[in-house]
């Protein structure tokens, strides 16, 4: 259940509910009293509604990985553990020699599913990808007496006010925090790259950094505050600039695919593997993969851009974004010669494939308001449409795709 504490968050839930019905995803918006029926231990100060996904839950990541591995073996896959890749070389045939500590493997296709190591693997193949590893905390409490007498668990709860999630972990409580101040890149002294011999590496907890959000979680779930904190876990999670995974063919390489940048990890694992496999085998997937295609990024998405956008994505994990809202982080990257002139004339810019493109002109100088209904951009856009329809307009096409078509029948 995700909580809404204002109309902005409720509007987003209604938007999600709309297309959930179209695709057959089971979700409902429930009132506060219904939330309490599912989780009677909460305080709902300021909560106006909740989005309940009836088929969701939580699972043990290790158990899921083992189940997937067993299933793969049953279908003929061979798994070699504790065998580090040391190099990648593409042959004239398009095949790859994958050099490992236990010998070289000749592969028709390579899939980069290396998690926090994905960028380093990509660099072995001669390319780079916009992935930044972030530190992320979760905390486990001591056993909670109120949970011991219950046969059912409370739902996983997500709360923008907490900027995190909380749930039951056996008979204890678990709080995960996405702090929006004092963020830390994992392995920052090493350029964000883990050591090759690192396995399941954890970092020292930073209680001061996450304390304000833990306090908010305890305000929502007072029974968490009745016991001690038993365990702090601070680990690494890879993120991409827009928060979506990299699933698809690598830019500029043949027979090299990405399956990485999944900031929600094992929760995305089954779907990522299924649809990527369809794409690889049949040339297409059952769903539109455009939002995940690694080719959505170009050379502009360098290390600095990736870091700026990933920090933004992390700190806004529980912030509701509305249509029309654009953040300045990592911008501008690509500008036409008219950028400054149009900006001084009131252009409101959006970012597309790294390009700064005017969306409309705010003659009153007001910033664009986001929303699902008419906003302050409506009248300005209407006036521009009328002007072009009745007279003439000039459009800067620098940030749009161009196609060079040549040949006898062009």
Language model: regions and residue ranges:
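Dinucleotide-binding Rossmann-like beta1-alpha1 core, especially the glycine-rich loop
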Residues: 1-38, 161-166, 170-176, 201, ...
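Helix-loop-beta segment of a Rossmann-like dinucleotide-binding subdomain
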Residues: 1-2, 36-75, 97, 192-201, ...
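A short, glycine/Asx- and small/polar-enriched loop/turn
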Residues: 8, 41-47, 89-97, 239-243, ...
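Helical element adjacent to the flavin cofactor pocket in flavoenzyme catalytic cores
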Residues: 51-109, 113, 117-120, 270
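Central helical "cap/lid" subdomain
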Residues: 100, 104-153, 287
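Mid-domain catalytic core of redox enzymes
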Residues: 125, 139-140, 145-184, 205-208, ...
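C-terminal catalytic lobe of FAD-dependent flavoproteins
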Residues: 161, 170, 184-188, 197-334
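Glycine/proline-enriched, intrinsically flexible loops and inter-domain linkers
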Residues: 287-288, 294-410
């Amino acid at each position: 259940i995700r909580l809404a504490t204002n109309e902005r968050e409720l509007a987003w839930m209604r938007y999600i509910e709309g297309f959930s019905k179209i695709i057959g995803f089971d979700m409902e918006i429930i009132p506060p009293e219904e939330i309490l029926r599912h989780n009677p231990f909460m305080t709902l100060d300021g909560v106006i509604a909740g989005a309940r996904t009836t088929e969701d839950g939580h699972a043990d990541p290790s158990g899921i990985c083992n189940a997937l591995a067993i299933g793969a073996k049953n279908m003929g896959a061979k798994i070699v553990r504790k065998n580090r890749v040391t190099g990648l070389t593409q042959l004239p045939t398009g095949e790859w020699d994958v050099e490992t500590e236990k010998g070289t493997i000749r592969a028709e296709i390579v899939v980069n599913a290396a998690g926090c190591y994905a960028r380093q693997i990509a660099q072995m193949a001669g390319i780079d990808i916009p992935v930044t590893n972030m530190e992320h905390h979760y905390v486990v409490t001591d056993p909670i007496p109120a949970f011991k007498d219950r046969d059912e668990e409370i739902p996983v709860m997500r709360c923008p006010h907490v900027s995190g999630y909380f749930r039951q972990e056996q008979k204890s409580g678990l709080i995960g925090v996405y702090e929006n101040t004092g963020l830390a890149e994992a392995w920052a002294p090493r350029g964000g790259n883990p050591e090759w011999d690192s396995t399941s590496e954890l970092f020292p907890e930073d209680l001061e950094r996450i304390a304000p959000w833990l306090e908010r979680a305890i305000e929502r779930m007072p029974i968490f505050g009745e016991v001690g904190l038993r365990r702090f876990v601070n680990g690494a999670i890879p993120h991409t600039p827009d928060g979506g995974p990299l699933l698809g063919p690598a830019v500029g390489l043949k027979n090299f695919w990405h399956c990485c940048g999944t900031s929600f990890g094992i929760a995305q694992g089954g779907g990522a593997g299924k649809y990527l496999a369809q794409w690889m085998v049949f040339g297409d997937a059952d769903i539109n993969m455009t939002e995940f295609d690694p080719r959505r990024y170009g050379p502009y998405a360098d290390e600095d851009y990736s870091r700026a956008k990933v920090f933004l994505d992390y700190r806004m994990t529980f912030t509701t974004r509305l249509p029309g809202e654009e953040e300045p982080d990592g911008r501008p990257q690509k500008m036409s010669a008219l950028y400054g002139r149009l900006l001084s004339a009131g252009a409101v810019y959006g970012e597309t494939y790294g390009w700064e493109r005017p969306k409309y002109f705010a003659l009153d100088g007001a910033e664009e308001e986001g929303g699902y209904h008419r906003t302050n951009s409506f009248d300005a856009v209407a006036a521009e449409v009328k002007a072009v329809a009745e007279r003439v307009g000039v459009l800067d096409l620098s940030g749009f795709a161009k196609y060079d078509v040549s040949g006898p029948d062009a």
